[in-house]
Amino acid sequence: MITFVGAGPGAEDLITVRGQRLLKEADIVIYAGSLVNPGLLKLCKEKCKIYNSAKMTLEEVLEVMVKGHGDGKEIVRLHTGDPCLYGAIREQMDELKKLEIPYEDCPGVSSFCGAAAALEAEYTLPGISQSVVITRMAGRLSLIHISEPTRLQLIS
């Protein structure tokens, strides 16, 4: 089985209990190295094959998934936050569907929730706001050289 797992918004202890279990059971883990906390890889068993997808193409990632599936391996595709929210997993799921390879999604704590917690903010307030709209800026935004407080404000 291939499972897309949400790693949470950064801190190692913000991955879900289910996500932890899937990492511990995985034979193969493909993680978004530029985004996922590498400390989470400590959960993997000793013989787990670990791939950093930061420099892999979609085709290379799929090749690892397809081969692993053919070998009967448990595969985790580890994405930051919640993979179903800006996780860029649609193209991977589409290809797996074409190949009739089963997969599932394990939700994670999204960065917008982590940002609210860090800022001690509440998104909805009775009589003030009952909705949350999630959107993002067009194009790529590098947050590497931005201070942590500013980064949290941008994320929220």
Each predicted region: which residue ranges?
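Class I S-adenosyl-L-methionine
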Residues: 1-109, 114
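Short acidic/polar capping segments at secondary-structure boundaries
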Residues: 9, 110-111, 138-141, 151
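Glycine-rich, anion-gripping cofactor-binding loops and their flanking helix/strand elements
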Residues: 14-16, 140-143, 147
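A generic local secondary-structure boundary/capping motif
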Residues: 18-20, 66, 120-124, 147
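Structured adenosyl-cofactor binding patch, chiefly the S-adenosyl-L-methionine
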Residues: 111-123
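Internal, active-site/partner-interface "lid" segment
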Residues: 122-143
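Single conserved hydrophobic/aromatic residue that forms the stacking wall/gate
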Residues: 144-156
